[in-house]
Amino acid sequence: MAATAQGDRARDYSRSNHHKPAQSTGTAERSRAVGYMPSVEDAARSMGISVSVVEIRNPIEIEEKLSGLKPHQGVIFPPNSFIAAHRARIIELLTRFRVPGVYFARFFVSDGGLISYGIDQPDLFRQGGRYVDRILRGTNPADLPAQSPTKFELVVNLKTAKALGLEVPATLLARADEVIE
């Protein structure tokens, strides 16, 4: 999916922080990620950004779909195993086209992506381990409450930001759980 940032808030933020106005931002995904889209659309609408979907159905479409992006646009990648499996190619293309990407997991940023915000995977595994422990101690699995992730992490790659010609705001860096330099 791709979202176009033409709203006043995007322009005002850019002016106040000495950045060029965002032209668009958005998401690419292999499927609609039904649970993910309403949140993205609501947040975009509140900032005056319109959202359009770009579906990537196979590896051949990756370059075809991403090559249409321009600098000052952006892409958000929702959780998706297809995107994760092809992350090296996606990161390479976005870097070549100078388009920032926001990803769902830290490993994208470790591999050269710009920013990730997502579930803290080790914490999620610990949470699962606690469930296994309770089951092994005799708790009926049907008696265990459903749980959602409780810990999320923000990771920023400053080397990638520099390669893209972006200045990451100090407020974002201060909130980051990890900054890769």
Give the residues covered by each predicted segment.
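Short hydrophobic alpha-helices and adjacent helix-cap/hinge residues
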Residues: M1-E181
